[in-house]
Amino acid sequence: MKRMTAKKRLLVVFIAAVAVGATVALVFIFQFFGDAVRERSDLYISARTDYPGLLDSLRPRTDHHWAFDRYAGRLELERSFKPGHYVLEPGMNVVEIARMLKLGMQTPVRVTLNYARTRAFLASRLARQLDADSAELMRALTDPQLAREVGTDSLQLFSLFIPNTYEFYWTVSPEDFVRRMRKEYDRFWTCLLYTSPSPRDLSTS
C-alpha cells in the first residue's frame, strides 16, 4: 500500500512537472512568436538615434518587451541596428521586428517635390521628408564636385529637380538623392522625347 502511494506521489510530481514545463514553453512561445503589434504604425529611426532612443520609440508600439530584449541581445542589435523608416504591421512578432531592424528592411517613403524658388527652400522642404537635415542637403545642392559628377555645374544643378512625387529610402544620403534626381531628370526628358509627336506627324495631321 505504501509502495503504491509512493508511486502515485511520483506520478503526481511527474505530471505536475510536465504541466509546469508545458506552461513555461507556451509562455515562451507566446512571448517570442505571439502578436507583438496591435495596430499599424510608422517607426522612424534616425541615423542620429542611439539604442535607448530606438527602444523609446519602439516600446509604445509593441508588446512582449522582455522577449524582444532577450532576442535583441542574441542578435547584438544594440551595435547593429540600421536606421530607417519601418512599418510595424499587426501580427508581427518580436523575432520579425528585431530581424527587420538588424537587416535594415525599411519601407520607402514618398517624397514630394513642388516648385522651389531657391535651393535653401528646397533643402528645407526635403529635410521635412528625409532623415538628412537642411544643412546636409544644402551642401549637396551647392557642391561643385557633385554637380560635375552628374554632368552639370552647381548653378544648373537646381534645374534637375522636376516637381513630382518619388519614392526614396528615408535614410538616403543627400549625395545619392542628387544622383537619383539626375536619373529621374534624364528619364523624364527621354520619355517626353519618345511620346511627343514629331514634326512629320504634325504636318500630316
Residue ranges and their predicted role:
Residues K2-S196, R200:
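Conserved catalytic or metal-liganding residues and their short signature motifs at active sites
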